[in-house]
Amino acid sequence: MKFSSIILLTLLICSMSIFGNCQVETNKKCQGGSCASVCRRVIGVAAGKCINGRCVCYP
């Protein structure tokens, strides 16, 4: 439950962002390419990529 509330809070802050370039960094390691399956599980959207060895999702 705690993890879900953190994600919801992050999405709320992102939706209030003036610039709209919010991202959700995960602890899931990756090696290049897409993180679509991870982002779909974490925030329900398949928009994400591997940055510095970690999946980063964009709502």
From Swiss-Prot:
The record marks 58 as: Aromatic residue of the functional dyad. Disulfide bonds join 30-50, 35-55, 39-57. The keyword Acyltransferase does not apply. The modification Pyrrolidone carboxylic acid is found at residue 23. The record marks 49 as: Basic residue of the functional dyad. Expressed by the venom gland. It is found in: Secreted. One of its GO terms (molecular function) is toxin activity. It comes from the Eukaryota. Residues 1-22 form the signal peptide. Pfam families: Toxin_2. GO terms for cellular component: extracellular region. Keywords: Disulfide bond, Ion channel impairing toxin, Neurotoxin, Potassium channel impairing toxin, Pyrrolidone carboxylic acid, Secreted, Signal, Toxin. Has the structural arrangement of an alpha-helix connected to a beta-sheet by disulfide bonds (CSalpha/beta). Belongs to the short scorpion toxin superfamily. Potassium channel inhibitor family. Alpha-KTx 15 subfamily. This is Potassium channel toxin alpha-KTx 15.5.
